[in-house]
């Protein structure tokens, strides 16, 4: 199971946004990457479908099955009903839809957290002052305070998400029967057919009309009195200043888990190690590269030293 999920994640990381532009060779290379992804998807179905079928039989069995008070995720998928395209009423999920949702649940959060962690460490290495301030907070705190009691750690994670949202563009489907569409404060007539709207989340976090010095990594902006004071990982009801996890009823359901993971990982790395530039290196290369996630074009290279006194 772990091997299949790892192969899927590796394939995802190699897929770049498809474009009609580019040379014929670029399109051939991209098609080969997509074919690899499709082949891995077949492997996921072969792996997961027997387990789905076995669980469905267990749920339908008259024999009692005690789950210890916890309900498996797959059981909620059995009960889910979605609109039935081209027909009245609602239907249950198809097997391929369940495979996609289970795969997303098991593995999709890994790549986003890893990408955010690399960006956070890159900026921390590039700015020793941020590392010193963050380590002071982590050393003085307890593990139980990582989630809610370390404001600067929270600010570092938010600043990383503002500058480097894992998915820089979020597409949303608009139905043809929409009453009206609001774009840039202007109402547009409903389209003749369904279409997609792309939200440029990456540009939103770098908007100079909203953020002061938007290209500067400055976690203090999310502390009291900063221009990001009160801004969180999900947008508020009045103004959308950043939305790294989406917004509305389609926001990412894993936002809570992602924030906890990033804080815990970052706190542990600051507590145990010193992070610095490699000897002879001038600065961290913060150039971005578009892949399935927004990643560093040149992977982070750092000199990591275990602290003499581990707190």
Which residue stretches match the model-derived regions?
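Cytochrome P450 catalytic-core helices
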Residues: 112-131, 135-137, 256-273
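Cytochrome P450 catalytic-domain helical core, especially the substrate-recognition surface
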Residues: 2-54, 78, 301-308
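Cytochrome P450 proximal C-terminal region
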Residues: 4-6, 139-142, 237-311
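Conserved cytochrome P450 K-helix E-x-x-R motif and the immediately C-terminal K′/meander segment
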Residues: 46, 143-186, 208
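Conserved, non-catalytic sequence blocks in retroelement Pol enzymes and Pol-derived host proteins
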Residues: 60-67, 143-151, 185-188, 250-256, ...
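Loop/turn positions that initiate beta-strands
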Residues: 191-194
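Conserved cytochrome P450 K-helix/beta-meander segment immediately N-terminal to the heme-binding cysteine loop
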Residues: 199-232
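Conserved cytochrome P450 catalytic core segment spanning the I/J/K helices
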Residues: 40-117, 145, 150, 172, ...
């Amino acid at each position: 199971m772990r091997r299949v999920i790892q192969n899927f994640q590796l394939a995802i990381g190699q897929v770049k946004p498809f474009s009609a532009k580019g040379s014929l060779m670029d399109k051939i290379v991209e098609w080969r990457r997509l074919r690899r992804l499709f082949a891995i998807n077949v492997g996921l179905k072969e792996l997961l479908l027997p387990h789905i079928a076995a669980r469905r039989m267990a749920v339908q069995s008259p024999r009692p099955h005690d789950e210890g008070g916890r309900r498996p995720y797959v059981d909620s998928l059995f009960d889910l009903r979605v609109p039935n395209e081209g027909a009245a009423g609602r239907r249950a999920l198809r097997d391929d839809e369940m495979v996609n949702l289970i795969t997303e649940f098991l593995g999709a959060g890994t790549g986003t957290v890893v990408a955010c962690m690399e960006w956070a460490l890159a900026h921390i290495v590039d700015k020793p002052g941020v590392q010193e301030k963050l380590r002071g907070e982590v050393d003085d705190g307890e593990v139980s305070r990582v989630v809610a009691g370390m404001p600067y750690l929270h600010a570092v994670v938010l600043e990383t998400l503002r500058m480097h949202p894992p998915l820089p563009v979020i597409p949303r489907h608009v139905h043809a029967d929409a009453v009206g569409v609001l774009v840039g404060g202007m109402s547009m007539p409903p389209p003749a057919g369904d279409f997609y709207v792309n939200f440029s989340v990456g540009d939103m976090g770098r908007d100079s009309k909203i953020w002061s010095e938007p290209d500067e990594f400055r976690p203090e902006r999310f502390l009291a009195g900063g221009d990001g004071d009160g801004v969180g990982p999900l947008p508020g009801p009045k103004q959308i200043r950043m939305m790294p996890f989406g917004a509305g009823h389609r926001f990412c359901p894993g936002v809570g888990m992602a924030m906890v993971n990033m804080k815990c990982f970052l706190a542990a790395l600051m507590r145990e190690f010193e992070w610095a530039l490699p000897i002879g290196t001038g600065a961290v290369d913060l150039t971005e590269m578009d892949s399935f996630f927004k990643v560093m074009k040149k992977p982070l290279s750092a000199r990591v030293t275990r602290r003499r006194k581990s707190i």
